[in-house]
Amino acid sequence: MKNNYTSLKSPIDEEDELKTDHEIDLEKGPLPEYDSEEESTLPPYSDHARLKNPPYTHREKNPSRSTDNSSPFLIKLLISFTSIILFNAPAVCYLKYKDAFFKNYGAAEWTLFGFWCLVCTLALISLTYFYETWTKAVKVTVISLAQCVKACGKGIKHFLKNWRNMIFAFCKSSLFCLVLLKAENELSSHLGDQQWGWKCSASAFTFMAVSSILIFIAETVEPGSCSTDLVKRVQAYCGYEARQYASSNTAIPLHEMNPENEA
């Protein structure tokens, strides 16, 4: 089958393409020879060539410029020394308060002081060398403590908001304790025996402590749960029993309602 393809380009367009092929880019320079048979070579000014040979950047001009943002050595040393001073400040203040700072030192005291200076020096070296590690640990600890304080503040606020009836709850529990103590004294004096009196006292105090705590919690969480609600429940129960009794007395028997069935 013959190829009947005919070019639609005019002779003028073909001359323009030949001119543009032979033009030289002033920025890129003349085109080097490209051998299409070699697979390893790439045509110049192509996208792959740009990826393999990235453009010259300003960062390559300064290869010695470091990107390390760590603190300088003197700042690390100063912060570590300040932390050691703050750690030793309470001991120095205590010695100043006792008026024993570098006074009447013997051989043992000077030996201990020298050992302590050695420990502080080693601590200073360690803190300076491991500066990033211990500062990060301090930051994490401070953040954790701040979160704990925030949580405790929310808990106290919730406690004060929901447990606002603490005074009345304390008064009710105290009144309950006084009544129970009076009953315990009467029972102990009535029994007379010391052994039984001691047992009654121990039982009464245990029951009083547990009951007062429960009453305090119940009255604080739900005010009136141990007094007002109890009275209301008793009144409701008594009213229910009265209604049941009245309904049972006023009920009409079936034979009175239907006398025809009886006949």
UniProtKB/Swiss-Prot annotation:
Its main location: membrane. One of its GO terms (biological process) is meiotic drive. Residues 1-68 are annotated as: Disordered. The keyword Membrane applies. Residues 19-30 have a biased composition (Basic and acidic residues). The chain crosses the membrane at residues 73-93, 110-130, 201-221. It is found in: Spore membrane; Vacuole membrane. One of its GO terms (cellular component) is vacuolar membrane. It is a multi-pass membrane protein. Keywords: Membrane, Transmembrane, Transmembrane helix, Vacuole. Belongs to the WTF family. Homomer. Interacts with other proteins that exhibit high sequence similarity. Acts as a suppressor component of the dual wtf meiotic drive system, and can suppress but not confer meiotic drive by compatible poisons. Wtf meiotic drive systems promote unequal transmission of alleles from the parental zygote to progeny spores by encoding a poison and an antidote from the same locus; the poison is trans-acting and forms toxic aggregates in all spores within an ascus, wherease the antidote is spore-specific and targets aggregates for degradation by the vacuole. This is Meiotic drive suppressor wtf6. It comes from Schizosaccharomyces kambucha. The gene is wtf6.
